[in-house]
């Protein structure tokens, strides 16, 4: 598959990724030690490696519908990020938004698989992590396809951005407060409806809802962390 074809296939995949119905994968879940933790992954196909990075409240199952098609020409690999199912997970663990650490985990994951250069396809908070990976490890990257990275630092100084981000943050308060209180059954629908619009959670399949529930620990960690959220800047993008 040439670069243009890869970009076209990836673009189509990214636009429907968030609405996937997760399905069981034929490949067994494998595990590898990377950056001091154990990461679960699935893979299919042979050839040039493409690594798929999921977003928040998700895991490697997000990509289940896509891997078979990519596996026709690539070694398609989808892994679960630290503190996401089926890895060890805890509300006291790594927040979903810790993009810098997740980016280093990705680099360690690539090395643990014995790979040198990879293509990356990433969604949401996983895409934010992929930006840190790309900046810090450009020698490991062949191409980067991102969908909805919350890289708000790239908009710094633009007119109206501060007010927009403030409004966005205020919309997330109910979900985060519910997560802090341990009311995950309320927190998940609230957050999904903020991101996807009113009724987005109810429109999700039972499989997707289960995946969201399985990955609530990292969302709770995000809501309770005292650590500053990593910021990806224009200066970093230019480096």
Feature locations, PLM:
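Conserved hydrolase catalytic core segment
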Residues: 116-155
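Short gly/ser/thr-rich secondary-structure transition/capping motifs
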Residues: 31-35, 58, 222-230
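Helix-rich cap/lid subdomain of alpha/beta-hydrolase
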Residues: 153-208, 223-226
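Active-site loop/oxyanion-hole signature of alpha/beta-hydrolase fold enzymes
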Residues: 77-121, 125
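Conserved HGGG/HGGXW glycine-rich cap/lid loop of the alpha/beta-hydrolase fold
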Residues: 34-92, 109
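Conserved serine/cysteine hydrolase catalytic core
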Residues: 207-239
């Amino acid at each position: 598959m040439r670069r243009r074809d890869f970009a076209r296939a990836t673009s189509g995949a990214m636009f429907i990724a968030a609405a996937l119905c997760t399905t069981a994968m034929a490949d067994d879940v494998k595990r590898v030690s990377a950056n001091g933790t154990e990461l679960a992954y699935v893979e299919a196909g042979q050839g040039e490696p493409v690594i798929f990075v999921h977003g928040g409240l998700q895991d490697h199952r997000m990509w289940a519908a896509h891997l078979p098609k990519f596996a026709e020409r690539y070694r398609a690999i989808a892994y679960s990020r630290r503190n996401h199912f089926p890895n060890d997970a805890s509300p006291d663990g790594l927040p979903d938004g810790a993009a810098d650490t997740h980016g280093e985990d990705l680099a360690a994951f690539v090395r643990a698989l014995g790979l040198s250069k990879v293509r990356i396809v990433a969604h949401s908070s996983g895409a934010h992590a992929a930006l840190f990976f790309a900046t810090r490890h450009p020698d490991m990257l062949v191409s980067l396809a991102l969908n909805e990275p919350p890289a708000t630092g790239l908009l710094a100084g633009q007119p109206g951005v501060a007010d927009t981000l403030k409004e966005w943050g205020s919309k997330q308060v109910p979900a985060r407060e519910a997560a802090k209180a341990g009311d995950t059954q309320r927190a998940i629908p609230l957050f999904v409806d903020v991101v996807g619009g009113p009724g987005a959670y109810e429109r999700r399949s039972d499989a997707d809802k289960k995946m969201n529930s399985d990955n609530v620990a990292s969302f709770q960690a995000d809501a309770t962390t005292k650590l500053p959220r990593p910021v990806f800047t224009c200066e970093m993008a230019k480096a």
